[in-house]
């Protein structure tokens, strides 16, 4: 179906009066969601089980979740100021800024500041190419320098949150009644003042962190209330800094901070900001939202639902678990690559390139750092849809309830797409390639992933899962590739030969002329070009090109094994040839006491047993 037909199909499903069919929605989404009519935001909410399938319940569910998030912000971000105030007014002097006991409110406050500091640093680095989280704040109503003291003053009698609640005619939430049938319609409330309040509090704590890093120990020990009371107005520098903290960045910081407070077992871990960024971006660019605060509320619960799928990867206690955690996932990924492409897996093993070196970030951040954001969003359409299908049908092979089935196949497709570059590179260059941003066409990778998925689901055994074996190989292309690489080596060697260099000498033998020493070049080049050499090779012996330059070989059951044996033999012959070449022209050789060389065996390309101590130039 074409693009317009897909849009109409999405509209029919999402606007249906009947309960939405999740299997049908997932089948559409796995092929990509059109970037129109807010389709992606609604589809992600449904597939992440944030919205129910019954459209009639959407409004009440959204209002309930937004009300819940608002209470979290009040209690966890703003309310700690009141906790410290009430503790001081109660006359309990046992708690103080230096108290390190677990029940100390001061210790909790400083721990929260450390979390905020780390979150702020990470968010500033998120999506740097788009500057999405680095924009200027555009608060609906900005306080002036003259009246800002009224907005941020800390009243010893009334709590700051209660003041905001009075302005909004909003009742403070102490608990969420699941049986409440008539939730507060938050969409009718003016959130601009509440958002402004959150902005000022969050900004004040972050600026305090920045000031503490350069202030004296005395200033660092001053209480938050003392700092705020001592400055009833925000100075010009703080006002200027207010514009530097963009609304999107502040919203992301609040989301991550609230999540860390609600999940103390896992807290905040670097990489969570990369999981949040695409989710928040999709909602923030949706034109159907009335204001950014509603987007922030929904993004928090979308992020929470996504973390349900990937939480095990962020649990430190599961890092080395044999059945859970990131190392278990990477081992499953390696096993799957071995089945798809044994030669590539073997090459990585021989070079000791462990998946930890390159795939750790792939899995923990869901490849959000490896591709441009539009490609990441398209990839997540398929990942989220595949996760939902696994939960619906209970079929998965990844050991994580299907959360990583599609992602593992996609990562295998990346390696298969880069296989030629990986096979010809050494350890360092391969690592550099795998850790860089990929300049690979996303549709091509997705199509390859779908092929791997189909192959895995229809294969009866591991041998049937071999993807590379089922493709035809053009040996002419292989020969040309080999020729180009060796010609490059040949030209480099020839260009670096000193004019006054001399060949190595046998014991009690005279030096050979320079012209004779260079006589290997015609044979070397003719063996690549398929031209019969004038010297240096036996008559009738096949050269590199004549062996590889055969008609296109459609590999049968044992075809690849035969080609591999043939290739190994040729590469070994070339290795001996180039090795002798290097020893012959680029060395400063020091002959050892024992050399078993005869005059008849001193020509290039003929094997000889010798013991030589060599200092070689590295090319």
Curated annotation (Swiss-Prot):
InterPro entries: Rab-GAP-TBC_dom (IPR000195), Rab-GAP_TBC_sf (IPR035969). It is found in: Cytoplasm. Keywords: Cytoplasm, GTPase activation. It comes from the Eukaryota. GO terms for biological process: intracellular protein transport; vesicle-mediated transport. One of its GO terms (cellular component) is cytoplasm. Pfam families: RabGAP-TBC. GO terms for molecular function: GTPase activator activity. Residues 34-387 form the Rab-GAP TBC domain. May act as a GTPase-activating protein for Rab family protein(s). This is TBC domain-containing protein C1952.17c. The lineage of its organism: Eukaryota, Fungi, Dikarya, Ascomycota, Taphrinomycotina.
């Amino acid at each position: 179906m074409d693009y317009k037909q897909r849009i109409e199909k999405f509209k029919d499903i999402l606007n249906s009066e009947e309960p939405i069919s999740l299997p049908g929605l997932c089948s559409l989404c796995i092929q990509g969601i059109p970037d129109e009519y807010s389709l992606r935001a609604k589809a992600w909410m449904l597939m992440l089980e944030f919205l129910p399938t019954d459209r009639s319940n959407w409004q009440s569910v959204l209002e309930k979740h937004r009300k819940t998030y608002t209470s979290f912000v009040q209690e966890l971000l703003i309310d700690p100021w009141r906790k410290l105030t009430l503790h001081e007014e109660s006359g309990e002097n046992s708690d103080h800024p230096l108290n390190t006991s677990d029940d100390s409110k001061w210790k909790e406050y400083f721990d929260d500041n450390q979390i905020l500091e780390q979150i702020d640093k990470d968010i500033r680095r998120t999506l740097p190419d788009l500057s999405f989280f680095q924009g200027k704040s555009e608060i609906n109503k900005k306080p002036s320098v003259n009246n800002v003291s009224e907005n941020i003053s800390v009243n010893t009698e009334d709590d700051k949150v209660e003041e905001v609640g009075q302005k909004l005619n909003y009742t403070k939430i102490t608990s969420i009644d699941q049986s409440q049938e008539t939730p507060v319609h938050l969409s009718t409330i003016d959130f601009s003042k509440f958002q402004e309040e959150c902005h000022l509090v969050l900004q004040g704590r972050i600026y305090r962190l920045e000031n503490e890093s350069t202030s004296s120990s005395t200033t660092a020990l001053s209480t938050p209330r003392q700092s705020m009371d001592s400055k009833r107005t925000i100075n010009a520098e703080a006002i200027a800094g207010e514009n530097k903290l963009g609304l999107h960045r502040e919203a992301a910081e609040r989301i991550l901070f609230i999540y860390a407070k609600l999940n103390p077992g896992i807290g905040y871990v670097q990489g969570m900001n990369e999981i949040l960024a695409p989710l928040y971006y999709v909602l923030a660019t949706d034109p159907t939202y009335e204001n950014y605060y509603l987007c922030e509320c929904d993004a928090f619960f979308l992020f929470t639902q996504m973390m349900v799928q990937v939480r095990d990867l962020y649990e430190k206690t599961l890092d080395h678990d044999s059945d859970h955690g990131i190392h278990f996932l990477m081992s499953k990924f390696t096993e799957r690559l071995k089945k798809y492409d044994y030669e590539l897996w073997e090459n990585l093993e021989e070079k000791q390139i462990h998946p930890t070196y390159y795939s750790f970030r792939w899995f923990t951040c869901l490849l959000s750092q490896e591709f441009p954001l539009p490609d990441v969003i398209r990839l997540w359409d398929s990942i989220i849809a595949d996760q939902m299908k696994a939960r619906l049908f209970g079929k998965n092979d990844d050991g994580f309830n299907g959360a990583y089935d599609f992602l593992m196949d996609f990562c295998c497709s990346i390696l298969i797409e880069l296989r030629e570059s990986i096979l010809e590179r050494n350890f360092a260059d391969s690592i550099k390639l795998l850790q860089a941003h990929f300049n690979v066409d996303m549709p091509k990778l997705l199509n390859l992933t779908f092929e791997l998925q189909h192959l895995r689901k229809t294969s009866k055994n591991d041998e049937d899962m071999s993807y590379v074996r089922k493709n035809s190989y053009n040996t002419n292309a292989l020969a040309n590739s080999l020729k180009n690489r060796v010609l490059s080596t040949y030209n480099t060697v020839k260009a670096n030969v000193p004019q006054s260099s001399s060949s190595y000498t046998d014991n009690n033998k005279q030096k050979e002329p320079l012209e004779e020493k260079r006589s290997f070049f015609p044979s070397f080049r003719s063996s690549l070009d398929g031209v019969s050499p004038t010297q240096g090779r036996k008559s009738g012996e096949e050269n590199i090109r004549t062996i590889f330059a055969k008609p296109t070989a459609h590999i049968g059951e044992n075809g690849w094994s035969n080609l591999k044996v043939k290739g190994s033999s040729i590469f070994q012959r070339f290795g001996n040839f180039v090795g002798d070449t290097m020893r012959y022209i680029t060395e400063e050789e020091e002959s050892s006491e024992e050399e078993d060389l005869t005059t008849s065996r001193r020509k290039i390309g003929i094997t000889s047993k010798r013991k030589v101590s060599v200092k070689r130039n590295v090319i």
